[in-house]
Curated annotation (Swiss-Prot):
Entry's Gene Ontology cellular component terms: cytoplasm; nucleoid
The protein's name: Transcriptional regulator MraZ
Gene Ontology biological process terms in this record: negative regulation of DNA-templated transcription initiation
Family statement: Belongs to the MraZ family.
Superkingdom of origin organism: Bacteria
Assembly, per entry: Forms oligomers.
Gene3D superfamilies per UniProt: Transcriptional regulator MraZ domain
Lineage start: Bacteria, Pseudomonadati, Pseudomonadota, Alphaproteobacteria, Hyphomicrobiales
Length: 161
């Protein structure tokens, strides 16, 4: 499996280290990095975005498609690259979360890792609980959006329902 899935709660120790879920470590290691890459989110919310090298390379490709002298590219690069951190796993599968990212997400003693396919999020548990309630309320309205992707998933000449 090459995607981040599931929800895991882990403690931050007194040195700012947190154990990355084994399944998340396996995804990043399979992509060639004995660590994870973390950066501030582009959407509203107090959490940290995380990924392996595959998604990080996709971010680089997206930025490369933008005008290299545009203000938007500069701002995106500042957040996605300048504020990012490559965090290597220690022998116990832990990473040291940088202070700037911990403060941004309001992380103190516990975090929730939430899989999101090619990337994942690291939340303060209370903030994630509130987000999850709101997501459960709103996601039924997104059904048509998800259904609109079905055409590209059906095999040629393929029937479907």
């Amino acid at each position: 499996m090459n995607s981040f899935r599931g929800r895991y709660t882990n403690k931050i120790d007194s040195k700012g280290r947190v154990s990355v879920p084994a399944k998340f470590r396996a995804v990043s290691i399979a992509q060639g990095l004995n660590g994870i890459i973390c950066f501030p989110p582009l959407s509203e919310g107090k959490f940290i975005e995380g990924c392996g090298p595959a998604f990080s390379e996709e971010i680089d490709r997206m930025l490369d498609r933008l005008d290299p002298f545009s203000e938007e590219r500069d701002m995106l690069a500042s957040v996605l690259l300048g504020e990012s951190a490559e965090l290597m796993f220690d022998a116990d599968g832990r990473v040291n979360l940088p202070d700037n990212l911990r403060e941004l997400a309001g992380l103190t003693d516990e975090v929730v890792f939430v899989g999101a396919g090619p990337r994942f999020q690291i939340w303060e548990p209370g903030a994630y609980a509130a987000f999850a309630v709101e997501a459960q309320k709103r996601v039924p309205g997104f059904r048509e959006l998800l259904k609109s992707t079905q055409a590209s998933l059906r095999p040629e000449g393929g029937g479907g329902r």
